[in-house]
């Protein structure tokens, strides 16, 4: 019985890994966020919105993050991630507006855009004060240009990017722990 459950879990991970790989290989912008807390009702509304707008959502729990994205020592990924893929930049901008209402529950980590030209033609809609969209896209485009110069394959770029993503999560967690530690020290005397 346990062996059967384990086999089923592995099959589910494999299926999700293929879904994520397919998501990264197809055209269209991608939002990657850390799902902090989203109640069932809001999550169902989000999924309904995704279906109505032809948007792909992949929810990856902590164990799946480790299995699917691998590990960068000494990193322990202990969060859940949500990957949102839109078919076009116009739809993607609408999705970002929708996600913005969950800004307390979904922490943006990365935004990937396939075509630099696409983002330039639509730059007016991207310029919003304090928008993570502009910051994340600019970082990714710089990284993408560097990868092109090195002549890196899509698979290598994806592996390197996921490692970079995990390191970003680790650094954010370290900063948070430091803030909490400083806060505790100031309260204790």
UniProtKB/Swiss-Prot annotation:
It is found in: Mitochondrion. One of its GO terms (cellular component) is mitochondrion. Keywords: Mitochondrion. Its main location: mitochondrion. Found in a 14.5 kb cluster region located downstream from rpl11 gene and upstream of orf796. This is Uncharacterized mitochondrial protein 21. The gene is DidioMp21.
């Amino acid at each position: 019985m346990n062996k059967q459950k384990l086999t089923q879990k592995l099959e589910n991970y494999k299926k999700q890994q293929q879904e994520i790989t397919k998501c990264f290989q197809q055209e269209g912008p991608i939002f990657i966020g850390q799902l902090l807390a989203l109640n069932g009702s809001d999550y169902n509304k989000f999924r309904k919105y995704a279906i109505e707008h032809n948007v792909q959502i992949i929810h990856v729990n902590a164990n799946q993050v480790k299995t699917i994205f691998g590990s960068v020592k000494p990193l322990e990924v202990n969060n859940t991630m949500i990957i949102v893929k839109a078919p076009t930049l116009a739809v993607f901008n609408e999705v970002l507006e929708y996600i913005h209402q969950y800004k307390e529950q979904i922490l943006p980590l990365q935004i990937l855009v396939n075509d630099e030209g696409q983002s330039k033609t639509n730059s007016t809609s991207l310029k919003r004060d304090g928008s993570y969209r502009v910051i994340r896209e600019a970082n990714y485009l710089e990284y993408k240009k560097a990868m092109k110069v090195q002549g890196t394959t899509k698979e290598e770029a994806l592996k390197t990017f996921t490692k970079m993503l995990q390191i970003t999560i680790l650094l954010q967690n370290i900063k948070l722990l430091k803030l909490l530690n400083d806060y505790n020290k100031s309260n204790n005397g």
